[in-house]
Amino acid sequence: MPIKAIPKVSIARNGIGAFVNPCHRITVQYCNWGGSSTHLRELLTNGGLNNYAKSKPDIFFEIKQLRGHPKLIFHYNNNVTKEVEIKNIKQNEIIKTLTEYSQRSGNELFKFNHKVKSINDSVRGIWSPLQVPKGYRHKI
């Protein structure tokens, strides 16, 4: 008698089966008059930002014209927003900033230099200097 598999609906997990981008919306704010927004205005007029937005269809781009310095606001899935000021930054640096922050998870960056922590016991056991034969022990 053949064994039949039980049908089950797959559970959506990030990285298994489907990938959900953590950055779901980017707001671009610029001033139409200010000098610090010139490079961003050039990026908007020559279609560079449009090409970038076409390459990222899973991110919603919102462009606002407000007074003040230009900035990029990144909205992440964990309800975190990051604001990055891009005043007087060249076009290629703006694109680099867009790619860098759109690939982040929204969590704070931290330096991972902690010791390994595990809930499992060590395979070798805990080392003790008394495990070494007496002839090889360190003598002071």
Swiss-Prot record:
A GO CC annotation given for this chain: mitochondrial large ribosomal subunit
Protein name: Large ribosomal subunit protein mL43
Pfam families tied to this protein: L51_S25_CI-B8
Subcellular compartments: Mitochondrion
Keyword Ribonucleoprotein attributed: yes
GO MF annotation terms: structural constituent of ribosome
Keywords: Mitochondrion, Ribonucleoprotein, Ribosomal protein
UniProt xrefs under SMART domains: L51_S25_CI-B8
Assembly: Component of the mitochondrial large ribosomal subunit (mt-LSU).
UniProt record, GO biological process: mitochondrial translation
Biological role stated in the UniProt entry: Component of the mitochondrial ribosome (mitoribosome), a dedicated translation machinery responsible for the synthesis of mitochondrial genome-encoded proteins, including at least some of the essential transmembrane subunits of the mitochondrial respiratory chain. The mitoribosomes are attached to the mitochondrial inner membrane and translation products are cotranslationally integrated into the membrane. Also has an extraribosomal function, being essential for mitochondrial genome integrity. May interact with MHR1 to take part in the mtDNA repair mechanism.
Coiled coil: none
Covalent S-S links between cysteines: none
Sequence similarity: Belongs to the mitochondrion-specific ribosomal protein mL43 family.
PANTHER family in UniProt: 39S RIBOSOMAL PROTEIN L43, LARGE RIBOSOMAL SUBUNIT PROTEIN ML43
